[in-house]
Amino acid sequence: MIKMLVCDIDGTIFNGKAFTENLVNCINRIRKDGVKFVIATGRTFYSANQIIKPLNVDTPVICYQGATIHKPSGEIIYEIGLERNLSLDILNYLKTMDIYPNIYINDRLFCEKETEHVKKYSDFQLIPYTIVPDISKNDFKTLNKILVIDNDTKKIEWL
């Protein structure tokens, strides 16, 4: 007997606009049969929660590819991140390659330089971003995610 169904959001159960009626009915049916329905995503909880509200998720939500797990209320029940010193080493290295990644700290998106990539990603993820010219001045202990988006495939391959 199946006890749990874990689904991603983007390109799996969500088409970028809405959940289909068939999907919602299927989720409700498996719940009635005692199957736990769980979301696992690379998104932040803030972003994921805006999308999954219509599904009335009552189980923990796995975010950042497993780096955080949240209760449906948003409370973090598990978190693992990159320590500050390692994060800063990575970010400084990326700067030497003229790469300015999306930086996630405490469910917020930061960038050191505004780019078209961060604007588009922010719109897609439904999460606002904050420009911080020097992230090392931000008082964080751990960083949740560093996301590199660049059109230069040679840079990406080299990473």
What is each model feature region?
Residues 2-17, 90:
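Asp-based phosphoryl-transfer active-site loop
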Residues 97-99, 104-159:
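Conserved acidic, metal-coordinating active-site core of Asp-based
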Residues 1-2, 32:
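Short, small/polar residue-rich loop motifs at catalytic or cofactor-binding pockets
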Residues 6-7, 68-71, 137-139:
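Short, basic/glycine-rich phosphate-binding loops at helix/coil junctions
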Residues 9, 75, 142-146:
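Short amphipathic alpha-helical segments
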Residues 21-118:
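Active-site phosphate-binding/coordination module
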